[in-house]
Amino acid sequence: MIKEILEKTGALMEGHFILSSGKHSSRYVQCARLFEFPEYGDVVGEELAKLLKKYDVETVVGPAMGGVILSYVVARYLKARSLFAERENGVMKLRRGFFVKPGEKVAVVEDVVTTGGSVKEVIELLKEYGANVVCVGSIIDRSGGKVDFGVPFESLLKLDLPVYDPEDCPLCKQGIPAEKPGSRGLK
């Protein structure tokens, strides 16, 4: 069902992409396209919330941009608070008056996990506040099982999409121009 929603909304894209991790791929998942259609965003959020319900989550936090809408929709179904972390001078922060209390049970959610870099940054940020990060959830896991967050990781769909280091990218070797659709904005 999730893959069909991604295809129907145009979220599953083909081409030559530079991922937020810096790696290259011939396929890209742009979940912002999925969230153009609130009815599909609701389906995805509810399904992910069902996976995370067993963790007794009090607050759901997503990294901007991919986790902003997702954290809201998942939190609504879990009857939890929804926050997002965003970059300030290249560093993940809780801004806009957001906070977590020491010991608060938090789920971190992200639309797509490849290397898990943004999620790991959010987990470290939340630990600085003393939060108890109990799980991570994503719509898509394209890590190939290589990511360890130190807490349970739940995803709605595992996609084995090709990922290349830039120096090994066959698309670069063919001279195909690359597009950088991500939003990580690292310095």
Swiss-Prot record:
GO molecular function annotations of the record: magnesium ion binding; orotate phosphoribosyltransferase activity
EC number, as in UniProt: 2.4.2.10
Record carries keyword DNA damage: no
Name of the molecule in the record: Orotate phosphoribosyltransferase
InterPro entries: OPRT (IPR023031), Orotate_PRibTrfase_bac (IPR006273), PRibTrfase_dom (IPR000836), PRTase-like (IPR029057)
Catalysis: reaction(s): orotidine 5'-phosphate + diphosphate = orotate + 5-phospho-alpha-D-ribose 1-diphosphate
A single GO BP: 'de novo' UMP biosynthetic process
